Structure formats: structure tokens, C-alpha cells
């Protein structure tokens, strides 16, 4: 992963729920109390890059009355709503029915990062099953539209799964990412990793078809 990887930067900017373990002067504005001390036990949402540093660091203080409280971490954190119990249960029931992009545009990257910070064996198993099930569906849709010459682009220019409405445009050098009905709804729910997978599968199918057509012409 490159230092300048935009997807990685956006993933690190995702906010997760955190609980402060100590009082911090002048940080009350994080809890809508400007000019006040942020009290121990306050819950605030912090970007992953900051939460990770605060969770790993410790205060370095020594409590002579209660040694167990010495050198506490500044914060503890929980899984973000995108990886909450409701989402996990829905993925267990039918991975293909959940629009992952509605949870997070970088769903798998977010989940991977969170699992690096904490042990979540159940979540890991659910995500593996989810990716495999959805990858098969993505490959199926990629084959269905692999022979066309039009390209579907959302307003954000991201293709399948892009936010906002899009339109089909003719582009000999672009992938045909358009598909109708329920299939289009599924593709709009793809996260960034899945969109890249779709493009690769689609372009591979298209290239194979073009190669076969050229062979037949010889």
C-alpha cells in the first residue's frame, strides 16, 4: 500500500466510537463543551489514524494507590456502526443482500484495519464468507455485461456502485459497467475493493471476447 494511496487515506479518516480513559484539559469541544475539560468516560468519534495512536499510547503516569491504574491508555474504542451487530447479522443471513457501500465506501479496508487493532474472530469469518459469496455474484454480472461497448459512470466518476445517478455513455476504451434491475442495485452497493474486482473481471471478459472474435476472423 502506497503512502499516497487515496483509498488508504480515506479509510484512515473514517471515524470510530472512542471512550476517553482520563480527563483531558481544554478538549471539551470534542464533546460540545468548549473551554471545558473532556472528562474520563466521555464518548466521542475520532478518525482511525488518531484513535489508533491514542489507544496504543499510554499516560506514563504512576498511581501509587492503585498500580493497576498506572499507565492507562488514553482511550478505548469500539467497532464502528458499519461493522455493528445488525450489519454482521445481515451478512450472515445473505451477504449479497447488503449494500456495503451504504455502510462505508471502503467497507473491507475499514474492516481489515479494525481487525488489525483488535481480535474479532467472528467478524473475520463473516467477512471471508461475505467476500467469497459476493465475488461470485460480481463475476457473474461482469460476464453478463462483458461484451458491450458502453460505460456506466456515476456522478463521482466511479462507475459501478458510484454515488448518485449515472448515465450510459459510449466509450471504446472504458468498461461497460451498466446493468439493469436488481443487478444494478447490487452493483451500486459495491465497496471500493469490489468495484475494482468488477472492473478487472469485466475487462478480462471483454478482452477474451475480442480475442476470440479476432481468432475467428483469421
Swiss-Prot record:
Name the Gene3D superfamilies on file: 1.20.58.2050
Instruction: List the biased-composition ranges (Gly residues).
Output: 147-163
Which subcellular locations apply to this protein?
Answer: Nucleus
A GO biological process held by the record: mitotic DNA replication initiation
Task: Name the UniProt key words of this record, in alphabetical order.
Answer: DNA replication, Nucleus
- Grouped into one coarse class, the protein's main location is nucleus
Give me the disulphide-bonded residues.
Answer: none
Q: Which CDD domains match?
A: GINS_A_psf3, GINS_B_Psf3
What does UniProt give as GO cellular component? GINS complex
Region of interest called Disordered, as start-end residue ranges on this chain: 147-182
Q: Which PANTHER family match?
A: DNA REPLICATION COMPLEX GINS PROTEIN PSF3 (PTHR22768:SF0)
How this chain assembles, per its entry, is: Component of the GINS complex which is a heterotetramer of div-26/sld5, drc-1/psf1, drc-2/psf2 and drc-3/psf3.
The family classification in the record reads: Belongs to the GINS3/PSF3 family.
Role played: The GINS complex plays an essential role in the initiation of DNA replication.
Q: What is this protein called?
A: DNA replication complex GINS protein psf3
Which organism encodes this protein?
Neurospora crassa (strain ATCC 24698 / 74-OR23-1A / CBS 708.71 / DSM 1257 / FGSC 987)
Amino acid at each position: 500500500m502506497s503512502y499516497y494511496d487515496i483509498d488508504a487515506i480515506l479509510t484512515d479518516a473514517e471515524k470510530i466510537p472512542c471512550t476517553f480513559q482520563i480527563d483531558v484539559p481544554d478538549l471539551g469541544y470534542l464533546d460540545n463543551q468548549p473551554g471545558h475539560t473532556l472528562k474520563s468516560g466521555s464518548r466521542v468519534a475520532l478518525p482511525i489514524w488518531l484513535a489508533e495512536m491514542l489507544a496504543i499510547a499510554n499516560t506514563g503516569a504512576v498511581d501509587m494507590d492503585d498500580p493497576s491504574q498506572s499507565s492507562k491508555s488514553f482511550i478505548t474504542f469500539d467497532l464502528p456502526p458499519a461493522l455493528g451487530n445488525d450489519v454482521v447479522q445481515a451478512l450472515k443471513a445473505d451477504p449479497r443482500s447488503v449494500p456495503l457501500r451504504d455502510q462505508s465506501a471502503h467497507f473491507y479496508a475499514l474492516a481489515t484495519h479494525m481487525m488489525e487493532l483488535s481480535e474479532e474472530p467472528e467478524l473475520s469469518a463473516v467477512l471471508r464468507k461475505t467476500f467469497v459469496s459476493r465475488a461470485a455474484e460480481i463475476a457473474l454480472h461482469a460476464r453478463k455485461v462483458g461484451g458491450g461497448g458502453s460505460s456506466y459512470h456515476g456522478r463521482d466518476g466511479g462507475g459501478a456502485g458510484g454515488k448518485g445517478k449515472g448515465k450510459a455513455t459510449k466509450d471504446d476504451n472504458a468498461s461497460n459497467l451498466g446493468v439493469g434491475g436488481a443487478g444494478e442495485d447490487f452493483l451500486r452497493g459495491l465497496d471500493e475493493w469490489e468495484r475494482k474486482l468488477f472492473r478487472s473481471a469485466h475487462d478480462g471478459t471483454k478482452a477474451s471476447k475480442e480475442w476470440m472474435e479476432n481468432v475467428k476472423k483469421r
